[in-house]
UniProtKB/Swiss-Prot annotation:
Protein name: DNA-directed RNA polymerase subunit Rpo11
Primary enzyme class: transferase
Gene: rpo11
Catalytic activity: RNA(n) + a ribonucleoside 5'-triphosphate = RNA(n+1) + diphosphate
Organism from which the protein derives: Methanothermobacter thermautotrophicus (strain ATCC 29096 / DSM 1053 / JCM 10044 / NBRC 100330 / Delta H) (Methanobacterium thermoautotrophicum)
InterPro entries: RBP11-like, RBP11-like_dimer, RNA_pol_Rpb11_13-16kDa_CS, Rpo11-like
Length: 85
């Protein structure tokens, strides 16, 4: 992960070695946060491009951390459901 833009209300991050999967779920969770004004990602080239996630919020770092924690919690819940089968 490399931060390429870090301003008070904006942040852009490159996720090396990742694909749509991680960025799309993070974007979705970020947009559930009322403090997030915008969240989007792009991949310049489908084969060799690295995803870039853009966040505009009151505190993008706090919003990203909260989104990551929410994702972890949802993954833990999913794992428990699968294990209970």
């Amino acid at each position: 992960m490399e931060v390429i833009l870090d301003k008070r209300n904006e942040m852009e991050i490159v996720f090396e070695g990742e694909t749509h999967t991680l960025c799309n779920v993070l974007r979705s969770i970020l947009m559930e946060d009322e403090k997030v004004k915008a969240a989007a990602y792009s991949i310049d080239h489908p084969i060799v491009g690295e995803p870039q996630l853009y966040i505009r919020a009151g505190s993008p770092k706090k919003s990203l951390k909260a989104a990551a924690e929410t994702l972890r919690d949802r993954c833990d819940e999913f794992r428990r459901l699968i294990e209970s089968l």
